[in-house]
């Protein structure tokens, strides 16, 4: 039986990464799951991690950025995601294609139609079974980022950029309610995990 594919999404500072290992551990405790693979984008493979460093720290044309994102994703799907799903394992990815539509599409203004062409070419019919969108107001995200490490290229973007990115995430969630669950990530970790527990019980 094919495994399930779960993605975590949200603007920088939303706090999604705090919960990935916890969700993975909850799923590993289930007897009906053959195994759980955690991964991330950009990255997830040796080549993908090299591209991640370029994407996070080098300035480039917005179309170049999108193409590199999808190049890393193609390798990620071929080497990690698809093989794991075929073996019946569940895959949890910290970001996937929704992030490209939100950041390069919403944030940078790249035409959705161009991204859809790349999406169809790179992943075909592959879509997450569940996308957890961790949503916070910009003020909350900014405060969390200010207290964190030195920002990368995306984390250092303007408030307007992050507002457009958040708006695109929420638009996509409204467009695909069967796949998305929007998490109010301003709440305590305990409250968020209570909600995640209920969501996981449905898949």
Swiss-Prot record:
Example GO biological process: dTTP biosynthetic process
Gene Ontology molecular-function annotations: ATP binding; dTMP kinase activity
E.C. numbers: 2.7.4.9
Top-level EC class as recorded in UniProt: transferase
Positions that bind ATP: 10-17
Organism superkingdom: Bacteria
Matches recorded under InterPro entries: P-loop_NTPase (IPR027417), Thymidylate_kin-like_dom (IPR039430), Thymidylate_kinase (IPR018094)
Keywords of the record: ATP-binding, Kinase, Nucleotide biosynthesis, Nucleotide-binding, Transferase
UniProt keyword Aminoacyl-tRNA synthetase, yes or no: no
One Gene Ontology term, aspect cellular component: cytosol
Listed SUPFAM superfamilies: P-loop containing nucleoside triphosphate hydrolases
Reactions catalysed, as given in the entry: dTMP + ATP = dTDP + ADP
HAMAP family recorded: Thymidylate_kinase
Entries under PANTHER family matching the protein: THYMIDYLATE KINASE, UMP-CMP KINASE 2, MITOCHONDRIAL
Protein family (similarity comment): Belongs to the thymidylate kinase family.
Function: Phosphorylation of dTMP to form dTDP in both de novo and salvage pathways of dTTP synthesis.
Entry protein name: Thymidylate kinase
Organism: Cupriavidus taiwanensis (strain DSM 17343 / BCRC 17206 / CCUG 44338 / CIP 107171 / LMG 19424 / R1) (Ralstonia taiwanensis (strain LMG 19424))
């Amino acid at each position: 039986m094919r495994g399930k594919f779960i993605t975590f999404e949200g603007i920088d500072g939303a706090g999604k990464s705090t919960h990935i290992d916890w969700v993975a551990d909850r799923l590993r405790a289930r007897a009906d799951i053959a195994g759980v693979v955690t991964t991330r984008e950009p990255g997830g493979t040796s080549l993908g991690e090299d591209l991640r460093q370029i994407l996070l720290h080098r300035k480039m044309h917005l179309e170049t950025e999108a193409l590199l994102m999808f190049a890393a994703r193609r390798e990620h799907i071929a080497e990690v995601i698809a093989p794991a799903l075929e073996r019946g394992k569940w895959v949890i990815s910290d970001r996937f294609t929704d992030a490209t539509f939100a950041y390069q599409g919403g944030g940078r203004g790249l035409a959705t139609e161009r991204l859809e062409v790349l999406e169809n070419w790179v992943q075909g019919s592959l879509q997450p079974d569940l996308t957890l969108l961790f949503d916070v107001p910009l003020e909350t995200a900014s405060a969390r980022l200010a207290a964190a490490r030195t920002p990368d290229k995306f984390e250092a973007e303007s408030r307007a950029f992050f507002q457009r990115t958040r708006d695109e995430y929420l638009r996509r969630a409204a467009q695909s309610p069967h796949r998305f669950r929007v998490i109010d990530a301003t709440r305590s970790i305990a409250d968020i995990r209570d909600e995640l527990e209920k969501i996981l019980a449905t898949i």
